[in-house]
Amino acid sequence: MDKKKKIKEISTTFTLTTFEINEIEKQKKYYENSRSVSIEALKIVQKKRGWVCDQAIIEIANILNLNPSEVESVATFYSQIYRQPVGRNVIRYCDSVVCYLTGYEKIKKFLEDYLFIKIGNTTVDGRFTLLPVCCLGNCDKAPTIMINEDLYSHLNPDLIPNLLELYK
């Protein structure tokens, strides 16, 4: 089987689960318009699958009677919607001006060296993905990182190895 045919088969066999469809339908009653529902729909799909593939964008658009490009624009606007597979744990480091002034570059460099990955990549074992975010809203406690939903403040490179051990 050639590669193009295999990709086409994968994309045409994707379907949202009944649970995902029902959850998206439930969200419709809480919002004025379909575009507003799209962020919730994206979160529903991502929660189950870990990321949102192209075919999921199309299916969400169909459910919400939107153009797929409208759903895609919402998905790419929000940094916490993943459009490609990520590791079991996502590390977001804040690269805002305040974090820059308080030393985020040392944190970033340490994470890259310690995990043997560059920004936007995932460790070989699939344990961590490293992503920048423009602000974590914790400027008075900078530099800051977020691992999954957990926020860590006043960081320095010496604290990071023990912190990462919490996320197996």
From Swiss-Prot:
Does Iron show up as a keyword for this record? Answer: yes
Q: Which UniProt keywords apply?
A: 2Fe-2S, Iron, Iron-sulfur, Metal-binding, NAD, Quinone, Translocase
* Residue numbers binding [2Fe-2S] cluster: 94, 99, 135, 139
The free-text note explaining how the cofactor binds reads: Binds 1 [2Fe-2S] cluster.
EC number, as in UniProt = 7.1.1.-
Q: Which GO terms describe its molecular function?
A: 2 iron, 2 sulfur cluster binding; metal ion binding; NADH dehydrogenase activity; quinone binding
* Family per record: Belongs to the complex I 24 kDa subunit family.
Please explain the role this protein plays, according to its UniProt record. Answer: NDH-1 shuttles electrons from NADH, via FMN and iron-sulfur (Fe-S) centers, to quinones in the respiratory chain. Couples the redox reaction to proton translocation (for every two electrons transferred, four hydrogen ions are translocated across the cytoplasmic membrane), and thus conserves the redox energy in a proton gradient.
**NCBIfam families in UniProt:** nuoE_fam, PRK07539.1-2
Q: This chain belongs to which protein, by name?
A: NADH-quinone oxidoreductase subunit E
Which organism does this record belong to? Buchnera aphidicola subsp. Schizaphis graminum (strain Sg)
